[in-house]
């Protein structure tokens, strides 16, 4: 059996980041969101999102009853740094790689649903993971944020340099 670990929303300007753990052959999965608070100024600089992602993966491993003899494929994104360390310490065999297939498809679909719960109408989906798809989603969401920047600030990844400048510029009289 193969376990896949992937993330969704790292480059999305609003919301937290989705983490999915999937058993490829059966489709069993665990999905949760690293909360938006982890991407605010102070917590983002401390990289607390790494611990948030690791916690979700650990819960997924318990839920799916992952065994040490299963192959594990984990996305290379930096949000998984602490998870990779945990996998090593726990004695799991794993490969860091680009994730595709069911984990990527299900994760992106669940993340789009999450964005809808934040109030974003019809967020563009990431299907092929192309630069154009990511750009289209980013600018669509930023147009939505610009409609009410102060009212939607709590949903933004304000730890990003982009938002430090964005909110500095929008607060000018």
Question: Which residues does each predicted region cover?
Answer:
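RNase H-like, Mg2+-dependent phosphodiesterase core
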Residues: 1-173
